Amino acid sequence: MLSHSQKVVRLYRKAIKSIRDYSEDYDMFLLNAGDLRASLKAGKNETNPFAIQQMVKQLEDFNSYWEHPDPYIPCDGINGTKWQRNTAPAKYAVDPTNHLLENGRE
């Protein structure tokens, strides 16, 4: 079971990724991410558990509404455009004990 702070951090990271997916340029991303961070900082010192639960629910609703249908995947990341394009050979595809060339030179 996740603690409250872990849940909020995961929701925040997911929201930031959704904002990144919809942002046309980096300046727009920074502006929207700053607004999100300011809204989270505004509720940071809240002590009423019902208000906290409502804020978390609003963040969950934000994430479900703004989830991008085609999210950005880094090219070197899993399922990116360069993922496993030039993979290394299998560990013992070449016999390590027989490393001499055909004509006898190393």
From Swiss-Prot:
Annotated S-S bridges: none
Membrane topology according to the record: Peripheral membrane protein
Compartmental location: Mitochondrion inner membrane
Biological processes annotated in GO: mitochondrial electron transport, NADH to ubiquinone
GO CC terms: mitochondrial inner membrane; respiratory chain complex I
Keywords noted in UniProt: Electron transport, Membrane, Mitochondrion, Mitochondrion inner membrane, Respiratory chain, Transport
Domain of life: Eukaryota
InterPro entries for this protein: NDUFB9
Subunit annotation: Complex I is composed of about 45 different subunits.
Record-stated family: Belongs to the complex I LYR family.
Database matches in PANTHER family: NADH DEHYDROGENASE [UBIQUINONE] 1 BETA SUBCOMPLEX SUBUNIT 9, NADH-UBIQUINONE OXIDOREDUCTASE B22 SUBUNIT
Function summary: Accessory subunit of the mitochondrial membrane respiratory chain NADH dehydrogenase (Complex I), that is believed to be not involved in catalysis. Complex I functions in the transfer of electrons from NADH to the respiratory chain. The immediate electron acceptor for the enzyme is believed to be ubiquinone.
Protein name: NADH dehydrogenase [ubiquinone] 1 beta subcomplex subunit 9
Organism of this sequence: Dictyostelium discoideum (Social amoeba)
UniProt lineage: Eukaryota, Amoebozoa, Evosea, Eumycetozoa, Dictyostelia
Name of the encoding gene: ndufb9
